[in-house]
């Protein structure tokens, strides 16, 4: 369905379009795919505010994410074992929580990577559950490993991202 409007929309007064689970973050305004993905990432990490570009995301990683971002990821369907294997070991996370420390830059980067790729999978498959299911199922392309296993490394995450874009464009199954 194409929405038409006669006058520019003030994003601060934008109407929320509801229809699918992820639509709660879509505003009735002209938003690029990148902006939408940045909004999804922020939501998954439990962060408020608006990122204007990927450069803002880099700055966020450099400032280090709060530990509550891990809790937000768990609330969005990421499993504890996935947190421990992709982002931060269990004991390290326990220490960070006890000391009320932020995640390290590396952990923050991995958290953003996980949020970005789970958001992309949800977008491609049209549903959060379907996206997570795809990420957790072994794939021949990944030599029998799951996409979630591949996300643990930057190189693996690039392959997962490439595969998701190919699926989205109808070039892969």
Language-model segment annotations:
Residues 1-173:
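Non-transmembrane "mature" sequence context
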